[in-house]
Amino acid sequence: ISNEDSQDIEFDETNLFSRNRFTGLDRVEGGQRLYYGMRFGVFGTSGYSDGFIGQSYRLRSDNNFSTTSGLNDNFSDIVGRVSIQPSTPVKLQYRFRLDKNDFSPRRNELSANVGPQALKLNLNYSFFDEGSGSGEFSDREEITYGFASQITPAWSIDASTRRDLQASSTLNHNIGLTYECDCFTMKLTFTRTFTQDRDVRPSDTIFIRLIFKNLGEIQSGN
């Protein structure tokens, strides 16, 4: 069976305990495995900090996983996260994947959210080395920054910019307007993308998403 939809694997703490870490339907993870991890935390009256670290072990290595996935050997890479919220308007989070042999970072993700609902600032930093996924891409280092504002109880706006730090270039701009009531949520998003590759050219996209809270959702993009 050809592998069309199970090539892109992102191993992290959210799927450490999953029975099948493959995406899609073309591959199924088999074999006997052991999962183990530790969760820790400190909780106070005004804030908290908590975290998780874990790893998996399989009795036999699995060559269905690529050598860059962190899952092909008996021991997997080490994955985890640390969250810190010293007060209500401030939240920091660090997510990681470390090489099982020398503990070098295969993936680093840092996020910070600061401010009340009236004006919340956000900053996200991501680093993926060339061996953190399918192995088809070189090292990636990106930063995304923006804000979100709850204008009224029903209306909110948000905007963000995503940049490639390796190439010192902007990848996209986003701006969104959201309306939410008891019956439905409507979100209008405008995205300007600057990616250029062969037949891919910079483009503008308007995306409308309508979610009925008891029925489902409708979405359209142009």
Q: What is each model feature region?
A:
Residues 1-222:
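Outer-membrane beta-barrel translocator/pore domains, especially the C-terminal barrels
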